[in-house]
Amino acid sequence: VYQEAKGNVSLRGTAYGLLTGYDATMKKDGGTGWLAGLAYQIPEIALKASLTYRSEIEHQLASRENVNTVVPGFGIPGVLPTQLFAYAPGKTDVTTPQSVNLDLQSGIMADTVAFLNVRWVNWDGFAIRPTQFGQALDQLAAAGNALPALPALAPTKALLTSLEGGNLVEYNEEQWSATVGVGRKFNAKWAGNVSVGWDSGAGNPVTTLGPTEGYWNVGVGVQFSPAPNYFIA
């Protein structure tokens, strides 16, 4: 299987603190993996089952980053503000995760089928850490480590030191999702379906770079077939 990946990031606003103003452009890169599957069916009862696996796919994106921030001196004698600036090309390694899909369908009565889809994606451990971004985080952490252990500086020191080894994007849990529903053919021209879905999320906090943390959904579909060779859904 062939996959393309690219990205553009611009961090703006007070929520990003010292990293606001960071920009990155990651050029398109293509990668290949492999796909394998099994399928089984019993036409008499409209039973269909399939199981597919997709491997990890590795990418190395040519990147250009703009880091322009200042590590403050916090008014401490001998601790001067430090300018972090970089506008440099580099490489960003990204590995998209392996996944498994299970699809089931079976007739439950005349002109009616039940269906189920279960999907697993191994997002646990996924991370994107562009070179200059990572170096900026580590320098901010170093500035935090250099702060004296004063009670008034404890929150700032803890915040800065927590940035060491950080990533632009990271997930720490496997993702599970499932959809179950029923479809029915009402007559020769009309059919419909209803479904309910659930997604566990990947353990990431909700941010502008990871806007959801799991969800439920409800779906309703209608299909109209004016002629045997085409339909409108």
Question: For each of these PLM feature ranges, what is it?
Answer:
Residues V1-A233:
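Outer-membrane beta-barrel porins/channels
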